[in-house]
Each structure stands twice: as C-alpha cells, then as structure tokens.
C-alpha cells in the first residue's frame, strides 16, 4: 500500500517529513516529492503550494508519477463550527468548491460543470480517521463538509453568504476540492483532514499566523494515527 500525502505549506508537512525514514526525493515543476516510510506505510509527501491550481498540479503529478493507492490532504482551515476551537480537526464527509457558480446552466451552487456537486471521501479512510480520533487526547475532531476556494476568508459578509449557500459547512480552505476533483477523475480514493488555524472572521489573519504551526502539527498527528489504522488490504 502506498499513500500520497499533500499539504499546501511547509508547516503542514514538516512534521510528517521529519518522522519519515528511508527517504528519497525528486522535484518536478518546482514541486518536491519525498518518498519514504511513515507509520509503517510507504508514503509520498509533497508541499503543493497554495490554491486550487497548485494543488491540482501537485495531485496530478503525484498520481501519475507515484501511483498511490489513496491520497490524504492535510493542513489548516478556517472553522465554522461553534463547538470546535483552534487546533481541533475536521474530517471530510464531503468536499465542495465554494467559489464556483455555473447555476445558469442548471448546476448547483459550487458545482463545476460536468463534475459532481460534492466529492465524497473513501469510507475506509474516514473510518480509519475516526478510529484515530480516540488517540488524539484533548484535540476534538468531527466529520463535516469542507469547502474550497481561492480566497482566504476573513470577511463576515462573505462568511454569511457562504453559510447561506452551504449551511452545513464545517471548514473552508484553499486546496481540498481541487485535490478531490483530480482524485475523482483518476479514480483514486481520498480524504481531507484539516486542523483549524482560525475561525474565518476578522481576526483570521492574526489567528492564522499565530496558530498555523499548531494546526499543522495536529493535522500531521492525525494523519500518522490514521496511517497506523490502515491494513495492507484496506484499499477499497
């Protein structure tokens, strides 16, 4: 079993890379891919860069060059659930674009033309993530809708509009739906795991800078615990 792991920024992958053994790396299109062993599994970890285009490029290269059995997207997100605090975790129950609008042609808000409205993670990966939750100590985790767009959300007016469109949204970020869409088209199972770095409000820029390292650590810890739950025949 080989697992691809994608984070957008250095703090989101640094703990994973530091824990890897037997590593080798190559750089393609200015994106470094580090192969090795983590939690007893063969993995390839990459820092994609920020945003949907960067994430799509990295995911496509990862799948084409390394043929992973599954892809995990790890990192930080802005939170929309009152019961969660900075550092807590959202496991994707589904992933959607929040900045896509082709409703004039009969699609749902957030649905890209000729694509599903929501991208659904592999149940076995979500199950493994839920088993890992019990080992997280004081860190809380829930399953929920994660939405993606090419904007850092820190405007209450925009937040209100997003919640009108996606009332069950638990978190928003800038890569997950792009990664999910690429995985969908290649037929590769995926899951998105995000730790909250801010609460998508006026304080978000300050919160993000202060808490990105904490969020990156918690998300990386969740990924490593998830990997420990996977058996060689887990892929479905």
UniProtKB/Swiss-Prot annotation:
The gene is mtnN. Its EC number is 3.2.2.9. GO terms for cellular component: cytosol. This is 5'-methylthioadenosine/S-adenosylhomocysteine nucleosidase. CDD domains: MTAN. It comes from Shewanella oneidensis (strain ATCC 700550 / JCM 31522 / CIP 106686 / LMG 19005 / NCIMB 14063 / MR-1). One of its GO terms (biological process) is L-methionine salvage from S-adenosylmethionine. It comes from the Bacteria. GO terms for molecular function: adenosylhomocysteine nucleosidase activity; methylthioadenosine nucleosidase activity. The active site is at residues 12, 198. Belongs to the PNP/UDP phosphorylase family. MtnN subfamily.
């Amino acid at each position: 079993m080989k697992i691809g792991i994608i984070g957008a920024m250095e703090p989101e992958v640094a703990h994973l890379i530091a824990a890897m053994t037997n590593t080798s790396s190559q750089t393609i299109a200015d994106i470094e891919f580090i192969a090795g062993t983590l939690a007893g599994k063969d993995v390839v970890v990459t820092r994609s860069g920020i945003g949907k285009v960067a994430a799509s490029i990295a995911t496509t290269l990862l799948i084409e060059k390394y043929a992973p059995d599954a892809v995990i997207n790890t990192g930080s997100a802005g939170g929309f659930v009152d019961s969660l605090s900075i550092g807590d975790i959202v496991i994707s129950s589904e992933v959607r674009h929040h900045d896509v609008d082709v409703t004039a042609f009969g699609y749902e808000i957030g649905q890209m033309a000729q694509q599903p409205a929501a991208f659904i993670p592999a149940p076995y990966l979500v199950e493994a993530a839920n088993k890992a939750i019990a080992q997280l100590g004081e860190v809380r985790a829930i399953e929920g809708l994660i939405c993606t767009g090419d904007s850092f959300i820190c405007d209450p007016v925009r937040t209100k509009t997003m919640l009108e469109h996606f009332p069950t949204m638990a978190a928003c970020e800038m890569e997950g739906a792009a990664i999910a869409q690429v995985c969908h088209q290649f037929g590769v199972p995926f899951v998105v795991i995000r730790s909250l770095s801010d609460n998508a409000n006026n304080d978000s820029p300050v919160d993000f800078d202060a808490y990105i390292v904490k969020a990156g650590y918690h998300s990386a810890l969740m990924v490593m615990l998830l990997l420990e739950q996977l058996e060689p025949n887990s892929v479905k």
